[in-house]
Amino acid sequence: MAAAETLNSQPTLGASSGTAAQLSQSEIDALRARISSCWSPPAGVNASSKIYVVLRVLFKQDASMSREPVLVEATASPLGPALAESAKRALLLCQPFTMLKPEHYDQWKDLELKFDPQELLGG
């Protein structure tokens, strides 16, 4: 997933930006791999697509989501709504996220995750 300089210091899919949450690189990599395995890009989105969405995800202690992800940021694109829905669907399908360590719950209970097809699809 990727880092966004404008995010509120929460880890994103691929890297962390800021210092609020400090997931290990192995946790980030495992989260990225898990979500990528559940994600089906919408029609018209590929590795060269220059669009992304950021979703805020709240987790319960069992590493499942406590509610539906909320769209925080998106590039202006006609494909944006479809990308946001596909990202939400991937998160719903992938839970629980057992790679997130219970002892670090305070660090991952509230994350903003960036879905960037260029990074998810290796563009």
Roles of regions detected by a PLM:
Residues S17, Q22-E27, P41-S48:
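Long, low-complexity, Ser/Thr/Pro- and Asp/Glu-rich intrinsically disordered
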Residues S49-V53:
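Short, small/polar residue-rich loop motifs at catalytic or cofactor-binding pockets
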Residues A21-D29, P78-E85:
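Soluble non-cytosolic domains of exported or imported proteins
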